[in-house]
């Protein structure tokens, strides 16, 4: 479980820097705050682009994972910093993203696209049968999240 936290830490940092940097630029341009907010926001956005390079996976996979974490962090930011409760459009957008993520998971189980590996099965048929015939799907998700590092989530 500690490995999972260590693997997710750069993603959380990148999301925090991206949201904070964009927020500072927004304050600077929209609310006419001090001029120091603009360069500071740009610096934070630049750091946000550098942080994901510490992940071992390739660029596309890292940014796909970063995108999911960014969505969650932006809603948390909206709730606690801007004091805005997410409305129905926010929830619809989140549901669309979760639906797309669910679709990608299904494709990886079928074996059409090997995006996410739940277990280290060799063939798509083994992946499907062993996933559904084991103790439970919940058990497999537990094994997936607790026993692999983030770099091994992506095949």
Swiss-Prot record:
Q: Give the UniProt entry's GO cellular component terms.
A: plasma membrane
Q: List the disulfide bonds.
A: none
InterPro entries assigned to the protein according to its UniProt record, in alphabetical order: UPF0060 (IPR003844)
Q: TM segments?
A: 8-28, 35-55, 62-82
Q: Does the keyword Transport apply?
A: no
Superkingdom assignment: Archaea
Question: Where does the protein end up?
Answer: Cell membrane
Keywords, A to Z?
A: Cell membrane, Membrane, Transmembrane, Transmembrane helix
UniProt topology in membrane: Multi-pass membrane protein
Q: Would you identify the family this protein belongs to, as annotated?
A: Belongs to the UPF0060 family.
Protein name as it appears in the record: UPF0060 membrane protein MA_3936
